[in-house]
């Protein structure tokens, strides 16, 4: 078999096209929607969390703006009525809104997965986005 030059993508930052009529603010959970565009995290079924927005961006039409998103582990607000705790370390936590996570997905509409709980630090949830 011949050698193949398989390129490596370096780093933990990606750029994604933003959904139509959408503003994503720096520091929000950033997600890919069912159409393949970036939106802010919300209590919506089927979102795929990809990291934290590194800039504030507004798109008028789908894809006319792009947003830089960073993967890694970030401290997010813990929903007081459905708290993530140390027993949840290693488990998924769920998106409640663009900067808050919760322990379960049982509300209607159900929550999308935010990422994996790494720790609880100062009452906030350390969430790993892959």
Task: Give residue spans per PLM region.
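Surface-exposed, low-hydrophobicity beta-strand/loop segments enriched in small/polar/acidic residues
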Residues: 1-130
